[in-house]
From Swiss-Prot:
Its EC number is 6.1.1.2. It comes from Agrobacterium fabrum (strain C58 / ATCC 33970) (Agrobacterium tumefaciens (strain C58)). The lineage of its organism: Bacteria, Pseudomonadati, Pseudomonadota, Alphaproteobacteria, Hyphomicrobiales. The gene is trpS. A motif ('KMSKS' region) lies at residues 217-221. Keywords: Aminoacyl-tRNA synthetase, ATP-binding, Cytoplasm, Ligase, Nucleotide-binding, Protein biosynthesis. This is Tryptophan--tRNA ligase.
Amino acid sequence: MNAFKPLVFSGVQPTGNLHLGNYLGAIRKFVALQEDNDCIYCVVDMHAITAQLVHSDLKAQTRSIAAAFIAAGIDPVKHIVFNQSAVPQHAELAWVFNCVARIGWMERMTQFKDKSGKNAEQVSLGLLAYPSLMAADILVYRATHVPVGDDQKQHLELARDIAQKFNIDFGGHIRNAGLGVNITVGDEPVHAYFPMVEPLIGGPAPRVMSLKDGTKKMSKSDPSDLSRINLMDDVDAISKKIKKAKTDPDALPSEVEGLKGRPEAENLVGIYAALSDKTKADVLAEFGGQQFSTFKPALVELAVNVLAPVNNEMRRLLDDPTHIDAILSQGGERARTIAEKTMNEVRDIIGFLR
């Protein structure tokens, strides 16, 4: 049971060009969630400096993410769209959570291990503490649900651990301050200030793979631009990339089982399924037995029809950066109001003078 008011939070880093995987795996899901939920969507620019401190185009990339949110259909009036650094309460709560969390928790994070590799002593403290800031991003609004991909599930589990430890460590203070609500964690009743945030995982294409290697996730950082379809790609670029996408010589199977061991075929079928809101089985019922020379043009047409309106609206918005800045500023003001209420209560719970 969760007695907290339902609230969805998610964020996207302003690093590299947004691509089809970001759209299908995250942004389109954000749009769908806003229909039945109160939502806060954040451009997490503070996270962007954890692995690379100096960026030449951070402001432009931040505007690009905001433009993509709005172009895809997110309503910045009904919901909140802002950039993380505009709300200093994120950093303040992250410091509290740094003191709640244990170093061992951070060092066990798979993403930290992957990014630090054998050079852990050379990476920033910010990269190690990334999950603590992510927990603060969510919990400074006491959000209850977060749409996440598989690569962020572990970080969300850590956010739950941090929330639970805070609730337990300060349980008496929370009650004495007249704050918190009664929830159930497992079978145990708990008086909690922070919710046990739940992941929202799923959708027809939660993982879109590289167009050049079906075993690797489509990535902003891949050196080959042919490996991904960027949201800012024009019709010619989309067509070229799909036509050059790696495939195998066999025809498409008639059943999903036949895609096993064929990662590139499975990726393209999965992309078609996601863009058309169909299942892979539906796609194979239509194209099974056909060669990629037939399937790829159909995929090009579908991708262009879905992405061109988003692309055009993004370009229109980016032509007027002051408008985007105004949207982010208004969203930041609304976000700060919520976050400051949380931090005032957290300060009281901890015992900070204010």
